[in-house]
Regions:
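Carbohydrate-associated surface elements
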Residues: 2
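Active-site core segments that coordinate phosphate-bearing ligands/cofactors
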Residues: 6, 13-27, 34-72, 83-102, ...
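N-terminal entrance/gating region of PLP-dependent enzymes' catalytic architecture
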Residues: 74-77
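A short, flexible beta-alpha/helix-coil linker loop
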Residues: 79-81
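A conserved helix-loop-beta module that forms one wall/lid of the active-site cleft
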Residues: 101-113
Length: 386
């Protein structure tokens, strides 16, 4: 991820009155990889080329324009990841545009709802590749908004947790609510409304570290080590931040343990999992949406022990998703939505969880985690003052 625009992020934030204002307007604090700071850097380092630039597209709107044979709009989903669009009215925010670069409002396509039609396909594709001249196109979106659709989580209450090197939480939102701490991001939901994306850097990175340290395989990680300890781990916690974490933004210089005693393999395995998902629960509370069901995906989702801890921490059913290429599937579903298809019908065909793999929360364990959560938050807060 490009982090070369930290100076530009600071300049944009200063110009509008601080990162709190940037976040309240755009859904995210000024982020180095987002389009706005990148445009500002381009305008500063090569002002002549910027002045000669007629139109600035995202990759999504650029390719949509190629298919339509004309400049088309940037959708609300991808447009929200630019630090330029106002979440309240879903239009370019003039304060952010002025803070970013001169005459930027003249260089951007308009914003539009994600399922807007962009017209018939270009004659080029009809003549060269045999597309039907009656083929309609819709504007494109980004990979994360399309994944939300493809995973069947476009309605508030359905939460997706993707377990990878970094763990990511996706959720639809009925209203544009922003993270008061600035860790999470808010984008437009392609099916209408809004969506959140919260990334936790130390995902499988931390789980792998514990597995290797105690010379476990994934089977023993689940069946042996995890079964040795009760929910709550008898008070033994850890912050598994092997790399500087981004949610919350803290560098602890490595993992931090709540106790000086030597952790057994069972204690360490449970500590890393409980801490990861208690941290996830803590830093998704601002969404204001209680999950009714959680879908998990990614390699670690196949591990029943990990899935059960998620179910117990959040207190809801957990399903495994079987949607390979969810962004691609979601893009196809978006095209169908643009042509008038019903979302629920599309989800029933393309976004179903694996049969017979649902895990239900254990009420006693969930109550234990409700009692542990304040202690975990206090343990985490100590690291910001130490």
């Amino acid at each position: 991820m490009d982090s070369s625009t930290s100076k530009e992020c600071a300049e944009i934030a200063h110009a509008v009155g601080g990162n709190e204002i940037v976040c309240s307007k755009s859904g995210s604090v000024a982020v180095e990889r987002f389009t706005g700071p990148q445009i500002r850097k381009f305008a500063k380092t090569d002002p002549d080329s910027y002045a000669q630039t007629k139109t600035i597209h995202l990759v999504s709107s650029f390719f949509a324009s190629i298919f339509a044979g004309k400049t088309v709009a940037i959708d609300h989903g991808d447009g929200a990841g630019m630090n330029l669009m106002n979440l309240a009215d879903l239009k370019w925010d003039q304060d952010l545009l002025r803070a970013t670069a001169e005459d930027l409002s003249e260089k951007l396509p308009p914003c539009a709802p994600s399922n807007s039609k962009s017209g018939p396909i270009s004659h080029y594709f009809v003549e060269k590749y045999g597309f039907s001249p009656t083929c309609e196109t819709i504007i494109w979106s980004g990979d994360n908004p399309c994944s939300l659709i493809g995973m069947g989580a476009a309605s508030p209450g359905k939460v997706v947790i993707s377990l990878g090197t970094s763990d990511t939480l996706f959720a639809a939102m009925p209203a544009p609510k922003t993270d008061p701490n600035g860790f999470g991001h808010v984008f437009g939901n392609p099916s209408g409304g809004y969506m959140s994306l919260i990334c936790f850097k130390n995902g499988s990175l931390a789980r792998e570290a514990i597995k290797e340290r105690y010379e476990l395989n994934w089977d023993s990680f689940e069946k042996d080590a995890l079964s040795q300890t009760p929910a709550g781990n008898n008070g033994s916690m850890m912050l598994p931040f092997y790399e500087p974490e981004i949610t919350p933004a803290i560098d602890t210089g490595g993992p931090v343990f709540s106790s000086d005693h030597h952790y057994s393999s069972g204690e360490a395995v449970r500590a890393v999992l409980e801490s990861q998902f208690l941290n996830m629960r803590t830093h998704s509370d601002w969404l204001g949406v209680s999950p009714s069901r959680i879908f998990i995906t990614g390699g670690a989702s196949e591990n029943d022990g990990i899935a059960q801890v998620i179910s117990n921490v959040f207190g809801v059913s957990v399903d495994r998703l079987d949607v390979p290429g969810s962004a691609t599937i979601g893009a196809g579903m978006r095209a169908a939505l643009g042509m008038g298809e019903d979302l629920a019908n599309l989800e029933s065909k393309f976004s179903q969880p694996k049969e017979g793999r649902t895990l239900e929360p254990d009420p006693t364990s969930h109550q234990t985690y409700n009692e542990v959560l304040p202690k975990f938050k206090a343990f985490l807060a100590e690291q910001f003052t130490s």
